[in-house]
């Protein structure tokens, strides 16, 4: 494995650890006491910025040697995810809201995991990302962690106060 890839994966590992700590200590304790729509809203707003993935298509931001198969897949997957996040925000408090959030989060997670799969198969080297290096090393770990929070909210969300009340009644 080339040394630049070691630094790349080490950067990603540190981001996963740091964002995991932030999520566990600051984000989840705040979200878990909110109603489902209120808990999902800030996470969906964050994901509406996934259009940043288009940076891999901008000449001069990335190396001309960046494999096009990887670049187009990652960029368009992110644009679709950003669009679904915005649609989820618009419909969140409607009858279709939760279903659209499920679609968004399934797509968004699959898109990020697909990029992890596509990168080595397309022959991507970390240096080819140029200025977009921060996307997989800083942003993607945050996005994956927040997808985990979204799934947790969708699967089990009940505000902490309601959980405490139900325990007292039992």
Kindly label every feature range from the protein language model.
Residues 12-14, 131-147:
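Small-residue-rich transmembrane alpha-helices that serve as helix-helix interface/gating elements
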Residues 26-29, 56-65, 117-125:
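Juxtamembrane "helix-exit" motif on the non-cytosolic side of transmembrane helices
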Residues 20-25, 88-92, 142-161:
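Membrane-water interface at the C-terminal end of transmembrane alpha helices
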Residues 1-19:
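Hydrophobic transmembrane alpha-helical segments in integral membrane proteins
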Residues 77, 81, 85, 101-120, ...:
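Hydrophobic alpha-helical membrane segments
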Residues 6, 66-76, 100-103, 125-136:
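Non-cytosolic membrane-interface motifs at loop->transmembrane helix junctions
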Residues 53-101:
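Membrane-proximal helix-loop-helix units in multi-pass membrane proteins
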Residues 28-40, 91-99, 159-160:
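Membrane-interface helix-boundary motifs at transmembrane edges
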């Amino acid at each position: 494995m080339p040394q630049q890839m070691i630094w790349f994966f080490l950067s990603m590992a540190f981001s996963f650890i740091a964002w995991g700590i932030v999520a566990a200590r600051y984000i989840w304790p705040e979200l878990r006491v909110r109603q489902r729509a209120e808990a999902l809203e800030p996470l969906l707003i964050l994901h509406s910025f996934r259009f940043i993935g288009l940076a891999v298509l901008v000449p001069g931001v990335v190396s001309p040697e960046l494999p096009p198969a990887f670049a187009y897949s990652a960029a368009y997957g992110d644009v679709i995810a950003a669009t679904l996040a915005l649609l989820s925000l618009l419909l969140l408090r409607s009858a279709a809201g939760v279903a659209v959030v499920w679609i968004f989060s399934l797509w968004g997670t699959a898109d990020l995991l697909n990029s992890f799969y596509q990168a080595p198969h397309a022959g991507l080297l970390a240096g080819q990302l140029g200025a977009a290096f921060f996307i997989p090393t800083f942003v993607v770990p945050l996005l994956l962690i927040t997808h985990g929070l979204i799934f947790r909210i969708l699967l089990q969300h009940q505000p902490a106060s309601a959980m405490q009340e139900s325990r007292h009644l039992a």
